[in-house]
Amino acid sequence: VPDPERIRSIASSFGWLDARLLHEGWLGRLGPEALGVLVFLVLAADRRGASYYGREKMARILGVERRDLDRGLARLVELGLVAHRRWSQHQQDGVWQVLPVPDRGPGDRHGPSPEDHDRRLPETLAAILSKLTR
């Protein structure tokens, strides 16, 4: 240990991340927005994994644009790492719950990774342009 005099100890309140996020490839599937939001939700969660922060406040605390926060939240829900229940039908905000890491790895979940989107972008643009020039 580089600094044995300064070993961390658990304070009165703490959050924890399942090590399977690292060892089973989840981190690479999240993308930076979702990873930042997941860390925030874990730190803000109560013992049931629930957090009651609104989207505007989360974005402000994280120092990100609202659209980036929304993209991160959507990715977490898509991968089954977070659940959401709205306060009402007419409000986007509500309760966010950090869920246990699914038993099957992220490669088994539906939806391409952010890297997959980046790799396919040139192909998608080429297909659109070829249709326009016909």
What is each model feature region?
Residues 36-40:
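Pre-recognition alpha-helix immediately N-terminal to the DNA-recognition helix
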Residues 60, 78, 87, 102-134:
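Short, low-complexity, charged/polar intrinsically disordered tails
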Residues 1-32, 47-50, 57-61, 116-131:
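Positively charged, structured surface patches that bind polyanionic biopolymers
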Residues 15, 43, 65-67, 105-107, ...:
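Intrinsic disorder/low-complexity signature
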